[in-house]
Amino acid sequence: MPRSYKEECSFLERLSDSAFLIKKGFVPNMKVEGKFYINEHLEKLMFDELRHWCGAQGIGGFLPGVKQIANVAALPGIVGYSVGLPDVHSGYGFAIGNMAAFDMSLPEAVVSPGGVGFDINCGVRLLRTNLEEKDVQPVKERLAQSLFDHIPVGVGSKGVIPMGAKDLEDALEMGVDWSLREGYAWAEDKEHCEEYGRMLQADSAKVSAKAKKRGLPQLGTLGAGNHYAEIQVVDEIYNEFAAKKMGIDHKGQVCVMIHSGSRGLGHQVATDALVAMEKAMKRDKIEVNDRQLACAHIKSPEGQDYLKGMAGAANYAWVNRSSMTFLTRQAFAKVFNSTPDDLDMHLIYDVSHNIAKVEEHFLDGRQRQLLVHRKGSTRAFPPHHPLIPVDYQLTGQPVLIGGTMGTCSYVLTGTEKGMTETFGTTCHGAGRALSRAKSRRNLDYQDVLENLAQKGISIRVASPKLVMEEAPESYKNVTDVVDTCHSAGISKKAIKLRPIAVIKG
């Protein structure tokens, strides 16, 4: 007999103004409890989704986010909590905005492609410049067009960076080092990438021929969906010390944010792994609550193959963002008749939003090696952590939070509290409030474009009819999401950026 909404809510316990606990029993076989972070505005969305599901008993679509967080807590080898960040919404298997860590020393511990997502190493990078808003405003339309001309965008877009089959093999294994070798990146860019832009366990042999075929023409392309390149202006500085370390010292300074991932290649790596893991689950008798949570023991051949292929796709995504950085620097140099160097177009940081990584964490009084899955969530390591660059040792790792089209973005920094509560993880963006299909039904793309124009935002878009899927109305309020993380102490606000021009697929 299905439980009523009231019965379901009896398993959810408020821990603080910004956190709830999901008690064992909410779904079967939970190994650990769940936890999610929300404020009062986001709380209504989360509970309404559960209420609607209880009424309809889950006809079609994904499970509610809170159920997905709990189902992840039932996976073998999970430790700590299954954590939902404030931008959490339902996704394939894991919710988007879900973090889960698995103890590598436990033979039953698993890796799940649904915990990384189809767009492996979808992520964001932020470049600063020495330009002011007043320098850009007179040439804003020309600059937006120059970016649109330089960066290939849209669903089937093909790259302009020359790449043969051998180059692709190298890029899959070398990441940003390939971009450096080929002259598409600056040496300092590598320092300011998560993992220094290269996952060493990558093995191009574990990326299928079909995935490579999809990836070969797409290098240096933005893709569609919520991917974008955005010219932004510093709107607010909350932490002057951290901002100065990032080269941001006043309001009105111009930055560029690039949001993209591993395109069709990453999607194929995930698809291939899910097929292999279904078989491995039968063989190893792994039981899960939701078949979308297909997984394999970390130490199994399927688990290892996926981790090596995923690392290759992650490296491809870093090369992709590096290539677009190269094209962005060219676009700016052309419009301002200068050089990227003279424009001070330095990379502040590059973070991943969809990835699984082996990390050392302190848990139950001892150091443990964990496989941390972050899907729609961002690594946020604290000051003095050995894995963050020298430049940010005193501030904590920069965390880049992209808003939705036409809304603000934020730069946060990692904290010690985040390290203990969420294994050094925070939110990644606004998080969807309306499905893509609902957005298309409810919103008119011309209204969305006019709204952006009224805000003084130039837009160049390859598929105007897809614009309403990415309209601000389709998403949660990014400020609510960021403020929740800030008040929970799992990351701290440093800088707020507002858009003045957007390039989209």
From Swiss-Prot:
Binding sites annotated in the UniProt record for GMP: 226-230, 353-354, 402-405, 409, 428-431, 504
Keyword 4Fe-4S: no
Family matches, as Gene3D superfamilies: tRNA-splicing ligase RtcB (3.90.1860.10)
Cofactor dependence: Mn(2+)
Cofactor, free-text remark: Binds 2 manganese ions per subunit.
Annotated catalysed reactions: a 3'-end 3'-phospho-ribonucleotide-RNA + a 5'-end dephospho-ribonucleoside-RNA + GTP = a ribonucleotidyl-ribonucleotide-RNA + GMP + diphosphate; a 3'-end 2',3'-cyclophospho-ribonucleotide-RNA + a 5'-end dephospho-ribonucleoside-RNA + GTP + H2O = a ribonucleotidyl-ribonucleotide-RNA + GMP + diphosphate + H(+)
Chain positions recorded as Mn(2+) 2 binding sites: 122, 259, 353
Record InterPro entries: RtcB, RtcB-like_sf, RtcB_euk
Signal peptide start-end: none
The EC number(s) this enzyme carries: 6.5.1.8
PROSITE patterns the UniProt entry points to: UPF0027
Keyword line: GTP-binding, Ligase, Manganese, Metal-binding, Nucleotide-binding, tRNA processing
Binding site for Mn(2+) 1: 119, 122, 227
Pfam family membership, one: RtcB
GO molecular function: GTP binding; metal ion binding; RNA ligase (GTP) activity
GO cellular component, one term: nucleus
SS bond list: none
Catalytic site positions: 428
Coiled-coil residue windows: none
Heme recorded as keyword: no
GO BP annotations, alphabetical order: tRNA splicing, via endonucleolytic cleavage and ligation
Stated family: Belongs to the RtcB family.
Any further remark recorded for this protein: Ligation probably proceeds through 3 nucleotidyl transfer steps, with 2',3'-cyclic phosphate termini being hydrolyzed to 3'-P termini in a step that precedes 3'-P activation with GMP. In the first nucleotidyl transfer step, RTCB reacts with GTP to form a covalent RTCB-histidine-GMP intermediate with release of PPi; in the second step, the GMP moiety is transferred to the RNA 3'-P; in the third step, the 5'-OH from the opposite RNA strand attacks the activated 3'-P to form a 3',5'-phosphodiester bond and release GMP.
Subunit: Catalytic component of the tRNA-splicing ligase complex.
Entry protein name: RNA-splicing ligase RtcB homolog
Source taxonomy: Eukaryota, Metazoa, Cnidaria, Anthozoa, Hexacorallia
